[in-house]
């Protein structure tokens, strides 16, 4: 498991779902449906009725569930390094994934050609998971309305190539002007535009359009013989007009400040100690060490530390953890999940009590629960599974300054790089990309080489102070699970953890 690319922070406080007016909501849904039917289905000689007929062929066998997932993705990327654009690429991929489920067994087939023949052959392949002998029924398609939680414009067309390159050069210009110690700048810009159409055996059909943009910045600072790195960036479900000069300057300043701070960093101390985690991106630790363990498949298989603990205390009082896929424009947000269900706000832990899991259709059915709109897949070539969207801890009642001031000795981890977690045990290790030594309630000096080691479920029980500054990351997170990567959001307020964490460093 892993989330990569990280930066902070957009205040969320208590996150409210964004609903448009009824008329705008209806128009947006109609626009999505018409665009997807025209540019994805009709462009490949298909109609919703064609998909229903293929599903009816699957339905002649004894299966519990089946779906067809059609997708067309356009992807563009640009990368600047050493003052020049080193690479630029544009790709279009389309195809179909067909799935049938019988009990705990799943049959899945996909094709990178989208036409009636590839769908028919895929349907014939997967239906053998169930015994033949049912009467065929062609259900009239009934389209499910998704939530209008983000715009639908194609970001690839929102700027021409010259303007995209100019944006990357602007990043370099700002970074080198910020401080003479910045000696190298790397910047990447990616745009994605997905068209999705889902047809299910129960007659439900759903369409979605998913834009996604990301700007990533890395700088190298040099002082004497010492070189240090700083990173920042952001994005979401926007077009490229989102990256205003003001926002780009903010990203650049964050990357530069991190690099310059690390130039002054001393070796991190090592040992058991109290830790304060900053708001925003440090929620990646919550995502990895706790969030994956709250996904339905791990709990159905009894491989999670949270298996069978609904209704039990699993965290300190005040700890409330939520997964919410319908926050406006966020990287992890979706109008519908990849099984055609609306995304939603799912409370997982409430005031320290485990109250629910994230579910897709299959695991929800097998556990006697309802889907929470968390069925996600990387592409048409992958079967869906329960996945996080935007996962965060809600606010507490303490000012972040008060939390730091309460720490006699310990580490304040402002930002994280990579990490690893074992879902079954909950054990994790994360590397801090920016951290400070705190003594007598004051920041003393930055430290380098700090790794945070602990057990996710145990750490939750030792949260002693929760800040009132809950924030989501800036919008560049990518989560990996079972070989599939999907965009996600993470977040939390400032937290003080009094036990259960070991800091690994070079200074004992």
Label the predicted regions:
Residues 6-508:
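N-terminal small-residue-enriched
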């Amino acid at each position: 498991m892993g989330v990569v690319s990280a930066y902070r922070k957009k205040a969320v406080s208590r996150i409210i779902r964004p609903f448009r007016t009824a008329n705008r909501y209806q128009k947006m849904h109609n626009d999505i449906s018409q665009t997807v039917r025209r540019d994805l289905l009709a462009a490949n000689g298909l109609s919703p009725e064609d998909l229903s007929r293929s599903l009816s062929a699957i339905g002649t066998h004894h299966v519990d569930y089946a779906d067809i997932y059609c997708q067309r993705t356009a992807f563009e990327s640009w990368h600047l390094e050493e003052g020049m654009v080193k690479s630029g690429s544009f790709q279009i991929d389309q195809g179909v994934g067909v799935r049938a489920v019988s009990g705990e067994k799943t049959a899945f087939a996909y094709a990178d050609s989208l036409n009636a023949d590839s769908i028919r052959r895929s349907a014939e392949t997967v239906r053998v998971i169930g015994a033949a002998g049912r009467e065929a029924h062609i259900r009239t398609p009934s389209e499910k309305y998704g939530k209008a939680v983000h715009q639908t414009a194609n970001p690839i067309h929102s700027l021409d190539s010259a303007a995209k390159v100019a944006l990357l050069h602007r990043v370099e210009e700002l970074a080198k002007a910020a401080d003479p110690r910045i000696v190298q700048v790397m910047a990447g810009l990616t745009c994605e535009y997905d068209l999705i159409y889902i047809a299910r055996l129960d007659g439900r059909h759903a369409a979605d359009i998913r834009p996604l943009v990301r700007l990533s910045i890395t700088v190298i600072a040099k002082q004497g013989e010492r070189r240090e790195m700083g990173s920042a960036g952001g994005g979401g479900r926007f077009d490229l007009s989102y990256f205003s000069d003001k926002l780009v300057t903010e990203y650049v300043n964050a990357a530069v400040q991190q690099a310059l701070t690390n130039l002054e960093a001393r070796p991190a101390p090592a040992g058991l100690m109290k830790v304060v985690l900053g708001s925003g991106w440090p929620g990646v630790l919550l995502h990895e060490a706790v969030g994956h363990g709250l996904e339905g498949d791990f709990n159905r298989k009894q491989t999670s530390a949270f298996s069978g603990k609904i209704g039990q205390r699993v965290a300190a009082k005040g700890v409330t953890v939520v997964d919410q896929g319908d926050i406006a424009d966020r990287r992890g947000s979706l109008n519908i999940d990849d099984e055609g269900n609306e995304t939603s706000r799912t409370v997982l832990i409430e005031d320290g009590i485990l109250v629910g899991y994230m579910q897709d259709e299959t695991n929800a059915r097998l556990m006697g629960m309802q889907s929470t709109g968390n069925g996600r897949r990387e592409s048409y070539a992958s079967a869906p599974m329960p996945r996080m969207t935007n996962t965060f801890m809600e606010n507490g009642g303490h000012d972040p300054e008060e939390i730091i001031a309460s720490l006699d000795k310990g580490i304040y981890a402002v930002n994280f790089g990579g990490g690893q977690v074992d879902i079954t045990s909950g054990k994790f290790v994360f590397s801090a990309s920016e951290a400070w030594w705190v003594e007598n309630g004051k920041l003393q000096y930055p430290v380098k080489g700090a790794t945070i080691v602990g057990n996710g479920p145990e750490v939750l029980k030792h949260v002693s102070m929760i800040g009132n500054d809950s924030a989501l990351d800036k919008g560049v997170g990518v989560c990996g699970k079972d070989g599939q990567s999907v965009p996600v959001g993470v977040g939390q307020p400032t937290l003080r953890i009094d036990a259960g964490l070991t800091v690994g460093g070079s200074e004992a």
